[in-house]
Each structure stands twice: as C-alpha cells, then as structure tokens.
From Swiss-Prot:
UniProt-listed InterPro entries: Aromatic_Lyase, Fumarase/histidase_N, HutH, L-Aspartase-like, Phe/His_NH3-lyase_AS
EC number of the protein: 4.3.1.3
UniProt keyword Signal, yes or no: no
Record family assignment: Belongs to the PAL/histidase family.
Record organism: Caulobacter vibrioides (strain ATCC 19089 / CIP 103742 / CB 15)
Residue location of crosslink 5-imidazolinone (Ala-Gly): 142-144
Name by which UniProt lists this protein: Histidine ammonia-lyase
MF terms in GO: histidine ammonia-lyase activity
Length: 509
C-alpha cells in the first residue's frame, strides 16, 4: 500500500484521490510541533478562568451553561456519545478513510487545540486500516457533519464499531488488536473531532473523482456512437470552438476529433452523404460535455480549498492565546460544489441516453431497427434503451439542488444549514446510474460499428471495440442481456475504456 506524507494546508487533489483509491497517509513531521503548541494554548486559555465555547461551556443552544473544571473530560466524552446519532447504511470505507485523512490534515494546522496523542491515534487508525463504521445519514452540513464525525470520534474512545480486514468489530476489540488504547479526551478535543465539514467534503471528493472517470468514459462512448451513426467530425473543428472560448468545450472537441482520427468509417461518407447536420446528441457533444468539464473543474477548485481548510469552531490562535467563535463549519461551499457535480453527472448521462435512442432508431441512424439483424423476431437493444431512460430520469430527480434547502436545528440556534452531506452523498449513486447508461451505449455503439464491416474505425476506437468484444460478443440473435450489460458496466467503472484510448481531458490531473 502506498503511504503518502501530508503537508497540512497544501495537499493536492491528486493525493486526496490516491487516498480514496486506497493509499494510506501520515502527517509531515513538521506538523507535530504546531499541534503541540495549539494544545498548550488551550491550557493557557483555560487558566484565565473565562468561559470559552466548547471548552468549558455546553454546546449549541446550551452554550450559556458553564462547565466546571472537574467535568471537562466528561463534557468532551458526552458530546461524542450524544452526537453519535446517525442512521442508515454504513458509509463506504473509501469515503470514510478519506474523511479521516481530511480531519487529520485539518487538526494538524494547529487551530483546533487537540493534543499530539489524539492526532496520533487518528493517524494510526488510518495507517492500520481501522475504519470507523459511520452511518450515512444524519448530517445537515452545519454545524459541520456532527453525527458522522461523532461516530468516528466514538471509535477513538472505544465505542461503536470498526471495519478492519473485512470484519466489522466492536471498536474496543479492533483497537486492542491493533495495539491501540482508547483515548480519554481532553478539553476541546471531542468538539474538535466532530465539528467540521470532512464527511461532506469526503463524499463530494469521491463524487468528483468518479465523475471525472465518467466524463472521460463518455468521451469514448460518444465518439464510438458518432462512428456507428456515421456522424460527422466537422462539428469538432477547432475553429468553431475557439470562437466560443470555453476551455472545456475546446478541449472536448479536440479529444473527440482525435478519437475519430483516420477512421475508415468516417472517410467512407465524406462525400455523397445527403445529411447536412447530425442530431444534437452527436453534434453538440463539445458544448454539452465541455460545459460539464468546466463545471467539474469549478467544483474541484472549491473542494481543493475546502480539503485544505480548518472548519472547526471555536478556532484556537496560539500566538494570542485566543479562542474565536465563527462559522467555518457551515458547508455551503461544499453544498454548491456537490450540486455542480450532480448537474454535470446528470447531463453526461442524459446526452448519452439520447445517443442510444438515436442508434436504435433506423430513421435517425440508418442502422437496423434496435441494432438487430432480424428486427421483429428479435428485439435487440429495445429494452436496454428503456433501462437507460429509466436511469437518466432517476438522476434528473436526484440532481435537484440540495443547497437551496435548509431547516432550523438546535432550538433555532442553528437556523440555517447547507445540506452539503445530503448533496454530496447522492453523487456516487448518480455516477453508478450514469455508468450503467454508458455501459449500454458502449454495447450499442460497438454493435452499430459492426454493421459497417469491413470498414474500421480509428485506432483508438478499434481498441475499445476489441476490448468490448473480448467480453461481449456481437449480438446476432436475442440472448440474456443482463450479463452483457454487467460486463460492459465493469469496463466503464474500472476505467478500462479510458485506458484503451490513452490520455483524455480531466479534472484533477
């Protein structure tokens, strides 16, 4: 397993992606003195005897309740246990590992007041593959992701459950097996662990990374569909897109043109083709997909910033021995980014479904009805297109912006919330739907190109066809379609379709 060294506040998206894909991480050695000084500042602040939110007071609406020194450890344990109130299925392990790494990098910036041993515990859990069981529902994205992060914090004090080595174990048992002792939380530490946007940000980053792969896969399946329909590559001429000026559109057009370069199928209909213009689902791919690329990059910029921030409250400033209360826990930037990703994922799937519909319609594609040599006796791709339509419509419903919703909590003390967690959690499910649509398009486009034999497509697209045919044979007569669709979906989800053609425009570099 790759082990990264995180420089708090300066971690690139590529490293967050690597952690999501399975890498481990430790903090740079330079972080530890900063952490220690922050914890020392908390002790100096306490010595002043003044009320400081979250250190010697209650929480939320109970902030006016002063807590005595003898109860400070109990206060921090209580907030963790009482706030570990999530429901639903466990969040995916890769997402929670990413959440842990995000929290680790945030705590290491010296504004949260936690002790070195507390941060070491979180680091060791990440390195040893101890992943807290975190229910997926329960956060409204302000004050931070309280419930999900509380489930993480609870495992650090030996409460709750942990995934390790494919097993789901009681936290105390999992810690003991790894040679770790449950923590006794010090002043401010419970609040520091559970206050922050790391759950929402981890889910949004996971969605971004998968959406990037989806985008690149759709460039490939879209180009193959254009070939199957004997579409023109003239709409991908760089002169058209230079005038529009949008960078994503320019890069997308260039990629599509390169994917179709030197195609025999394309050359066969350069002359004497009565069609003047292709349907929008072919002709406007650069405009639609380019806009999706641009908006994904905007979301990536926001999430790269959020991933390197401190979203705790209150914040500790050791140089002045001050604790300042603010609102960095409000995840509105993450909510907006998640909404942008959702829109892009929805549109990528939507235009892909339209290409499938075009291919199965002989009036539009010039191919046999439903891409079967014997229409009537065989139904061919009739129902796979219906499945694609169902998936796309489901994604349209899910794409409704989460950030426009809010509901007051904590007796109206927390009266405006971001809904970032909900907005980010839906992304992986949306990508899964869109992946299935692209898998269907991959099969349909490969089938369509088969009808143009012996003419061949470009070298890149022929590699994709060969890959597809290595898993799914040509459809001559109706057969059980589900296994074919699953095989194609695997080619999309694994990134094999992208690997077959080489470098494509991306989001995270």
């Amino acid at each position: 397993m790759t082990e990264l060294v995180l420089n708090p506040g300066a971690v690139p998206l590529a490293e967050w992606k690597a952690i999501y894909r399975g890498a481990s991480a430790r903090l740079a050695e330079s972080a530890w003195p900063v952490i220690a000084e922050s914890a020392a500042a908390v002790q100096r602040i306490l010595a002043k005897g003044e009320p400081v939110y979250g250190i010697n007071t209650g929480f939320g609406k109970l902030a006016s309740v002063r807590i005595g020194d003898a109860d400070l450890e109990t206060l921090q344990r209580n907030i963790v246990l009482s706030h570990a109130a999530g429901v639903g299925e466990p969040s995916p392990v890769p997402v929670i590992r990413l959440m842990m790494a995000l929290k680790l990098a945030s705590l290491a910036q010296g504004a949260s007041g936690v002790r070195v041993e507390t941060v070491r515990m979180l680091e060791e859990m990440l390195v040893e593959g101890l992943t807290p069981v975190v229910p997926c529902q329960g956060s409204v994205g302000a004050s931070g992701d309280l419930a999900p992060l509380s489930h993480m914090a609870a495992t650090m004090i030996g409460v709750g459950e942990i995934f390790v080595g494919g097993q789901r174990l009681p936290a105390a048992q999992a810690l003991a097996q790894a040679g770790l002792e449950p923590l006794t939380l010090g002043p401010k530490e419970g609040l520091a662990l559970l206050n922050g946007t790391q759950f929402s940000t981890a889910n949004a980053l996971a969605g971004l990374f998968e959406a990037e792969r989806l985008f690149q896969s759709a460039l490939v399946t879209g180009a193959l569909s254009t070939e199957a329909a004997k579409g023109s590559d003239t709409p991908f001429d760089p002169r058209i897109h230079t005038l529009r000026r949008h960078v994503g559109q320019i890069e997308t057009a260039a990629a599509l043109r390169a994917l179709m370069s030197a195609s025999e199928i394309r050359a066969s209909h350069l002359k004497e083709d009565e069609r003047v213009q292709d349907p929008y689902c072919l002709r406007c791919q650069p405009q639609v997909m380019g806009a999706a690329l641009d908006i994904l990059r905007q979301a990536a910029t926001t999430l790269a910033t959020e991933a390197n921030c401190v979203s705790d409250n209150p914040l500790i400033f050791p140089e002045a021995d001050e604790a300042l209360s603010g609102g960095n826990f409000h995840a509105e930037p993450v909510a907006f980014a998640a909404d942008m990703i959702a829109l892009a994922v929805c549109e990528i799937g939507s235009i892909a479904e339209r290409r499938i519909a075009m291919l199965v319609d002989p009036a539009l594609s010039g191919l046999p009805a439903f891409l079967t040599p014997k229409p009537g006796l065989n139904s061919g791709f009739m129902i796979p297109q219906v499945t694609a339509a169902a998936l796309v419509s489901e994604n349209k419903q899910r794409a409704y912006p989460a950030s426009v919703d809010s509901i007051p909590t904590s007796a109206n003390q927390e009266d405006h919330v971001s809904m970032a967690a909900h907005g980010a959690r839906r992304l992986l499910a949306m990508v899964e739907n869109a992946d299935a649509v692209l898998g269907i398009e991959l099969l349909a486009a490969a089938q369509g190109c088969d009808f143009h034999a012996p003419l061949r497509s470009s070298a890149a697209l022929e590699a994709v066809r060969a890959l597809t045919r290595s898993k799914v044979p040509h459809l001559s007569d109706d057969r059980h379609f589900h296994p074919d669709m699953e095989a194609a979906n695997t080619l999309v989800r694994s990134g094999a379709v992208i690997a077959a053609v080489g470098a494509l425009p991306g989001v995270t570099a």
